[in-house]
């Protein structure tokens, strides 16, 4: 590649995300890191570059802050929508804390709880919420089910800050627990509850416990299948985004170790907000900050010598809107060369 000529060390990995664009088998790409390091800008820019080499790209935000709309200057929701100015790039914003009742209703109108008035109001929700993480797990499973039915060639996830990023790895276990609890409930009280539910109009959407069990099993199968794909380096990779500061580097190392323990491929780090002051720059603060950044950059290069480490400059203006995102995205595939 042309940018390889810019690398003085022949053995150094290319400091770009070009390898991700070249890997045509990739289906899932996660972009994650500490809050405020430029995850959304990076994921939007990566999706833009992917749209140049792939037939169809879907960008999904699972961050409750939902910055995709702000980044593109266009409102997105829980349904995939084409990004203005593109024919093969769509985006959607999902709430990972979507309610269990909405899922059970399968998109239908909210109905009065059939168990209300029997001293059992909200019982199904209480049961579900008693399992840690099940709400997010089912919401995520539902989204994956939607995504599977759509024909996107590659899906980019703009994830929530680090602490929540890796929850999807626990979803199969969470859903197994939920299924076991519901199975136990169904076997013990199924006939009685179905009888009560029948007299009260059933669960939302006219479902009974058997329908609920079937839905849970279907979601579990979907999650299990996708989880297998997540652990296949030919199909899935994780792009870490950070800044050259101690806390961000610490979070990145913790995240990479956790990804490795789960068998998730990661081989790229984007370091944002780097300063490149000129040698005769009189700004003491700029030079001091650059000195600090240089120290952590050296640590990153030493720790992750087998990673593609992309160095991105701190810009004088916000990266918002299609044109600025496209300009920023070019630096993900062509190494930034600071002015002399």
Swiss-Prot record:
Q: What GO molecular function terms would the record report?
A: ATP binding; ATP hydrolysis activity; metal ion binding
Catalytic activity, EC = 3.6.-.-
What is the first-listed, main subcellular location in coarse terms?
Answer: cytoplasm
Name a single GO biological process.
tail-anchored membrane protein insertion into ER membrane
**What is the name of the gene encoding this protein?**
get3
- What InterPro entries is this protein classified in? Anion-transp_ATPase-like_dom, ATPase_ArsA/GET3, ATPase_ArsA/GET3_euk, P-loop_NTPase
Q: Which domain of life is it from?
A: Eukaryota
Q: Which UniProt keywords apply?
A: ATP-binding, Cytoplasm, Endoplasmic reticulum, Hydrolase, Metal-binding, Nucleotide-binding, Transport, Zinc
Q: Where does ATP bind?
A: 34-41, 245, 272
The UniProt similarity line reads:
Belongs to the arsA ATPase family.
Recorded protein name is: ATPase get3
Q: How does it assemble?
A: Homodimer.
Recorded GO CC terms: GET complex
Q: What is the annotated role of this protein in its UniProt record? A: ATPase required for the post-translational delivery of tail-anchored (TA) proteins to the endoplasmic reticulum. Recognizes and selectively binds the transmembrane domain of TA proteins in the cytosol. This complex then targets to the endoplasmic reticulum by membrane-bound receptors, where the tail-anchored protein is released for insertion. This process is regulated by ATP binding and hydrolysis. ATP binding drives the homodimer towards the closed dimer state, facilitating recognition of newly synthesized TA membrane proteins. ATP hydrolysis is required for insertion.
Q: Which organism is it from?
A: Talaromyces marneffei (strain ATCC 18224 / CBS 334.59 / QM 7333) (Penicillium marneffei)
Identify the residues that bind Zn(2+): 283, 286
Q: What is the lineage of its organism?
A: Eukaryota, Fungi, Dikarya, Ascomycota, Pezizomycotina
Gene3D superfamilies documented for this protein = P-loop containing nucleotide triphosphate hydrolases
- Keyword Nucleotide-binding in the entry? The reply is yes
Which major enzyme category is it? hydrolase
């Amino acid at each position: 590649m042309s940018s390889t000529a810019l690398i003085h060390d022949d053995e150094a990995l290319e400091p770009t995300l070009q390898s991700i664009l070249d890997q045509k088998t990739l289906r899932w790409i996660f972009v994650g890191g500490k809050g405020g390091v430029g995850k959304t800008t990076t994921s939007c820019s990566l999706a833009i570059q992917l749209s140049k080499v792939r037939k169809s790209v879907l960008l999904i935000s699972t961050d409750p802050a939902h910055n995709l709309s702000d980044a593109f200057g266009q409102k997105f929701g829980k349904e995939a929508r084409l990004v203005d100015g593109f024919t093969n790039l769509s985006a959607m914003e999902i709430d990972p804390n979507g309610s269990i009742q909405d899922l059970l209703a399968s998109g239908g109108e909210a109905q009065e709880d059939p168990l209300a008035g029997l001293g059992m109001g909200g019982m199904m929700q209480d049961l579900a919420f008693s399992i840690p993480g099940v709400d997010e797990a089912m919401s995520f499973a539902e989204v994956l089910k939607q995504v599977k039915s759509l024909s996107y060639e590659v899906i980019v996830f703009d994830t929530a800050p680090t602490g929540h990023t890796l929850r999807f790895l626990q979803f199969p276990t969470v859903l197994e627990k939920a299924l076991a609890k519901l199975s136990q409930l169904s076997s013990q009280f199924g006939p009685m509850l179905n009888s009560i539910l029948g007299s009260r109009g059933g669960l939302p959407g006219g479902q009974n416990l058997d329908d609920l069990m079937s839905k849970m099993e279907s979601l579990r199968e979907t999650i299990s299948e996708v989880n297998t794909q997540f652990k296949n380096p030919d199909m899935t990779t994780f792009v870490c985004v950070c800044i050259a500061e101690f806390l961000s580097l610490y979070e990145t190392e913790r995240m990479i170790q956790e990804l490795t323990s789960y068998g998730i491929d990661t081989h790229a780090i984007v370091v944002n907000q780097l300063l490149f002051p000129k040698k005769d720059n009189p700004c003491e603060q700029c030079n001091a900050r650059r000195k600090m950044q240089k120290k952590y950059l050296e640590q990153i290069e030493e720790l992750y010598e087998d990673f593609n480490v992309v160095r991105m400059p701190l810009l004088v203006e916000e990266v918002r809107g299609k044109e600025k995102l496209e300009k920023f995205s070019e630096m993900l595939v062509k190494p930034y060369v600071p002015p002399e």
